[in-house]
């Protein structure tokens, strides 16, 4: 469970903590809290720990976009993300047409604030941003979110989250073609 209404101050604090440790705005729809995601990750975490995986949970205000970006070059074996996903076929750039929603995204999704005015990320992680990460060494990414396997189709294949994570170096993906309720 992520807090999509996380305050800007909390987001800035979390962004600074992540930095020390290692956009879309086309409508006014706000992202609602997904209570099932908290149950999902707190159920999976002990299972992974019992299988000798190191587990880091980032929920509520800690679930900022920078947490995923901080995994770049970390050779994390498995990444499981339970949140909102989106696909907007009207985007002019295929890699901007889909993404994942992180804590605090409602502050930017529905407001007139510009990304350039912020010293931290906006909580909306696009496929384009993901494609610039180095996730080599990541065996599996699980995206428990709506429509994560959708993308724009061109002569070069599908442009979306699947291409972004593969370009970033992820070996395998578990994604959905439908809305997750």
Model-identified regions with their sequence ranges:
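Catalytic cores of enzymes
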Residues: 1-181
């Amino acid at each position: 469970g992520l807090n999509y209404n996380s305050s800007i101050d909390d987001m800035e604090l979390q962004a600074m903590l992540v930095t020390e440790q290692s956009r879309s705005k086309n409508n006014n729809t706000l992202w609602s809290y997904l209570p099932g995601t908290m149950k999902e990750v707190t159920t999976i975490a002990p299972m992974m720990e019992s299988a000798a995986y190191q587990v880091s949970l980032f929920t509520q205000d800690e679930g900022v976009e920078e947490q995923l970006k901080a995994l770049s070059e970390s050779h994390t074996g498995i990444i499981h993300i339970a949140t909102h996903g989106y696909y907007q076929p009207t985007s002019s750039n295929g890699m901007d047409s889909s993404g994942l929603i992180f804590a605090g995204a409602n502050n930017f999704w529905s407001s007139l604030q510009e990304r350039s005015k912020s010293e931290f990320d906006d909580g909306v992680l696009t496929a384009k941003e993901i494609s610039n990460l180095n996730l080599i060494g990541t065996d599996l990414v699980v995206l428990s979110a709506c429509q994560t396997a959708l993308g724009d189709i061109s002569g070069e294949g599908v442009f979306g989250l699947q291409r972004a994570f593969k370009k970033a170096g992820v070996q395998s993906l578990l994604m959905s073609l439908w809305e997750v309720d």
